[in-house]
Amino acid sequence: CIRDVHTARCITDQFMAHAGLTKDRTNEILTMPWEAILKAQAPMFRGFNLHAAGPVFDGINFEGNDALALIRQQTGPRISLLMGTNRDETNLYWHIYHVHDMDEGLAEKLFGNRAPIVMKNYRKIPKDENFHQRFVHFLTEYIYRAGDIDMAETASDAGQDVYLYRLDWDRQAYKACHASETQFLMSMGSVIHAVDASPAPEELKEDKRGAFTAFIKKGMPAAEGMPSWPKFNRENRRIMVFDHPCHVERAAASETDLAMPFQVFAL
C-alpha cells in the first residue's frame, strides 16, 4: 500500500509527537541516536499494525495518489514483474495476534478511512462453523490479494510481462500463512510450526527457488520439473500455484467491494 501525501504527513506527525519534536526542529532527526528513533516509533508498531511505515507519494518523485495511473502511463522502463501472495496470508494473525473477528477499531487501524467499506462486507460473513476459513480469506483478499490482482491486470494491460503465483502449501500448523514462503526461498521458517517432514517441502523449495532465481537472471521464471509458467493477462488469467505438485490454474478476479480503492489504507 503506497500512502498518499496526506496519510504520510499524518503518520509523520505521529512520529514527531512521540519523538518530542516540532516542525522547526525536524533537522534533529538527522542526529538522533538510533535508540531514540526506535523508542519514538515503538508505539506506532505496537500490536497488529501493518501500516505504520511504508512507501509514500512524496509529491516530488511521484505525483498524485494513484499507483495504477503511474503504471498505465508507462513513463519508466518496461520491466517484467513476478508477483504473488500466499493463500492464507492472514491466518498468521489469527494465531499470533489472535485476530478472530473484526470491529470498528481494528478496521480503522488496518484500513483507515476505508474501514466503513470493509466493515459493511465483513458483516456479511456467516458466523458458522466455517467462519475461521471465510474470515481468513476475507482479510487476505482485502489486505493482500486484491491489490496484487489489480496491479497485475493494470501492468499487463500496459504491456508489461507479468508472472503471477500463489503459495498454497498448507502442510503446517498455520497453513499457507504470511511469511511461510521464507522456508522455501531463504531456508528460514521462524513462523512455521509442525511442518510436514516428508521430502515434499524440499522438492517445493527447489521448484520455487529455481523459478525465482531464473526470473532474477533471465526475466522468466522456470525450474526443472515444474510446469511451464505462462504470462498473466486480464483475459488469459494464468497463475502458478506452488504446492506439491505445482500446477497452473485460472486466477480469480478481485473479490473486494467495487468501492474499495487500490490504496487500502488512508487517513
Predicted regions and their residues:
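Sec/Tat-exported extracytoplasmic proteins
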Residues: 19, 33, 122, 126, ...
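A general structural motif at alpha-helix termini
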Residues: 30-33, 41, 122, 186, ...
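Mobile gating loops/cap/lid regions near enzyme active sites that modulate substrate access
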Residues: 146-149, 153-267
